[in-house]
Amino acid sequence: MYRVAIEKLLKWKQSKRRKPLIIEGARQVGKTWLMKEFGRQSYTDTVYINFDSNSRMAELFASDLDTDRLIMGLELYVGHKIDPNNSLLVFDEVQEVPRALASLKYFYENAPQYHIVCAGSLLGIALHQGTSFPVGKVDFLKLYPLSFKEFLMATGKEQFAALLDSQDFQMITSFKQTYIDALKHYYFVGGMPEAVQSFTENKDFNEVREIQKRILAAYEQDFSKHAPNEIVPRLRMLWNSIPSQLAKENKKFIYGLVREGARAKDYETALLWLSDCGLVHKVSRVNTVGIPLRAYEDLKAFKLFVVDVGLLGCMAGLRQRTLLDGNDLFLEFKGALTEQYVCQQLKTIEDLDVYYYTNDRGSCEIDFVVDTGERIVPVEVKAEVNLRAKSLKTYHEKFAPEVSVRASMADYKKEEWLVNLPLYAIDQIVQI
């Protein structure tokens, strides 16, 4: 299975300023596989330590963090010398041993020749709870579920993925039905690696759904196991409200849908916990535009998306036939799935900040506004071929962006002020 993150890891390996690397991401997005596969491809030796199941290694890091001593202990454990140039040290579930996390500082300062990558299912929570390691001593990489392009490659459509990157939209349009069919499959399967692997091997949508149910059950178990007891009920209510939040025409998160009379302050900790786990994407509102967009963020108004479009469909109880064959009653939630899909793809683009826009009167709403660092791009999302873009026109007249994007099932078309970008090509948004 190809992951774009492998290329990022290769750049990390070759960097003269390389630091120990922490890979962040939700449970089961493929962090362990990625680290092992990177070691297999790029090193002659991989030293893999899982701190959740290895008490001996926990004891090694319990005393002083002298790097020579730690390397000696690791060598004794694996039974051979560790070559700084050819060995990859993999610390998995590193949040289980905070001292191992703290040791990264000393590896960076005293033994930078060693190549170290770390990950953990709930590492984001550990970092925000004050687990000790100095800022500036580590590199970070965020891992998400497979993007649509990675899904194409995983399902044997490597040439179609490469064609998207070529931006030969005349050729792309000739094969649009292939892309549309694959996109429908992606809406159902999503990008969780186990679900994608099952789909590529068996093409069994029922089996995919069972895998997604198991993943969601594991997330719920994490709530009980790792979250503070006092917020667990609120976590569950907030998490389970997301499909109904996104089913609304106005997808702004409303606490009253979580529980009648609910207030923001009652759920702030639960929301932060879900965000730190990587289970949700919080997309905040802006009501004006400038670089950086973050300076205009309205923290009180936001949309909440889940980590994966396939999991959202599973949470909502969508059936295979409804999604793949179409149903008039499904049209409203199809908009929710499409916005979820677009948000998910935008999040996989490095250094892209994602917001949404409404004016103060609420008469103009743009589904997403992205900050590339060089320009602000408004994105209006249409689930079908609908080419109306009233809000986008209003936004364009007010802010005169360099480019405005309508993402829909229609073919690529560049007009005077507007680009219609097919949904299956949304990852090309920075280059157009």
Per-segment meaning from a language model:
Residues L346, I366-V385, S404:
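Conserved catalytic cores of phosphodiester-cleaving nucleases, focusing on short active-site segments
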